[in-house]
Amino acid sequence: MSVLINKDTKVICQGFTGSQGTFHSEQAIAYGTKMVGGVTPGKGGTTHLGLPVFNTVKEAVEATGAEASVIYVPAPFCKDSILEAAFGGIKLIVCITEGIPTLDMLDAKVKCDELGVRLIGPNCPGVITPGECKIGIMPGHIHLPGKVGIVSRSGTLTYEAVKQTTDAGFGQSTCVGIGGDPIPGSNFIDILKLFQEDPQTEAIVMIGEIGGSAEEEAAAFIKANVTKPVVSYIAGVTAPPGKRMGHAGAIISGGKGTADEKFAALQDAGVKTVRSLADIGKALAELTGWEVKKA
């Protein structure tokens, strides 16, 4: 088992023939992802990377039976792309793009929720079930099929947690980057719920960052609902208030959203927190009693 995606998930790409869409689709195909086609308006009827190109998502879904779509489209057009996928019959939308206007995302998220469509992102690395399916921009080779579910607001910090769990021999069930924007399509709680219900996931790593209250809300959810061991790291311990730290959502405002507040909430929920990213693998081993693979 895994969450969201597996080896049978049929995936299309919106923005398929663009440079980003082309590069990352090639990587996904090489990884073994079941890519079945792509969408670029005006190029329908042609082929690209040996796969059919369609003018619309609806046509692509009807012809291929696609269930998931990954979006590599410039920010001003992302809202339309997300809505087209949602109304076109796609059940899982993964939007990688950064810089989408907040009001656009608000609208897109509400529509996806109404339609029962799962949206991951934007401004995220995507989703991967190691050895089976890769939807997004993460490096496939650092992943190992295994038993740790990873959910994160940061892309590169996810890769660090992945590398440590791979090196330790624990591996990952599924890794989900929820993105660093103020309005994510799916939040920590949405993904924690899936990991809690997934029999393959035996432990969870949650990587948060300063800004907003997503981690505090996740802590309350963990305290009430999650029985699996959880290790967490919060980025931005030394961040000054009022300064945006990379992501649009990573800002301490009105004295709220500091790393210390988040660490405290998580510790209160029984989560094992680490102050250094380098300690994630070690903390997992301590919490679970798993044996670390010798290098």
Swiss-Prot record:
Keywords: Ligase, Nucleotide-binding, Tricarboxylic acid cycle. It is an enzyme of class 6 (ligase). It catalyses: succinate + ATP + CoA = succinyl-CoA + ADP + phosphate; GTP + succinate + CoA = succinyl-CoA + GDP + phosphate. Gene3D superfamilies: NAD(P)-binding Rossmann-like Domain, Succinyl-CoA synthetase domains. GO terms for biological process: nucleoside triphosphate biosynthetic process; tricarboxylic acid cycle. Pathway: Carbohydrate metabolism; tricarboxylic acid cycle; succinate from succinyl-CoA (ligase route): step 1/1. It comes from the Bacteria. GO terms for cellular component: succinate-CoA ligase complex; succinate-CoA ligase complex (ADP-forming). InterPro entries: Cit_synth/succinyl-CoA_lig_AS, Citrt_syn/SCS-alpha_CS, CoA-bd, CoA_lig_alpha, NAD(P)-bd_dom_sf, SUCC_ACL_C, Succinyl-CoA_synth-like. CoA binds at residues 17-20, 43, 96-98. Pfam families: CoA_binding, Ligase_CoA. Its EC number is 6.2.1.5. GO terms for molecular function: nucleoside diphosphate kinase activity; nucleotide binding; succinate-CoA ligase (ADP-forming) activity; succinate-CoA ligase (GDP-forming) activity. The keyword Magnesium does not apply. PANTHER family: SUCCINATE--COA LIGASE [ADP_GDP-FORMING] SUBUNIT ALPHA, MITOCHONDRIAL, SUCCINYL-COA LIGASE SUBUNIT ALPHA. Belongs to the succinate/malate CoA ligase alpha subunit family. Succinyl-CoA synthetase functions in the citric acid cycle (TCA), coupling the hydrolysis of succinyl-CoA to the synthesis of either ATP or GTP and thus represents the only step of substrate-level phosphorylation in the TCA. The alpha subunit of the enzyme binds the substrates coenzyme A and phosphate, while succinate binding and nucleotide specificity is provided by the beta subunit. Can also generate UTP or CTP, although it preferentially synthesizes ATP and/or GTP. This is Succinate--CoA ligase [ADP-forming] subunit alpha. It comes from Pseudomonas aeruginosa (strain ATCC 15692 / DSM 22644 / CIP 104116 / JCM 14847 / LMG 12228 / 1C / PRS 101 / PAO1). The lineage of its organism: Bacteria, Pseudomonadati, Pseudomonadota, Gammaproteobacteria, Pseudomonadales. The gene is sucD.
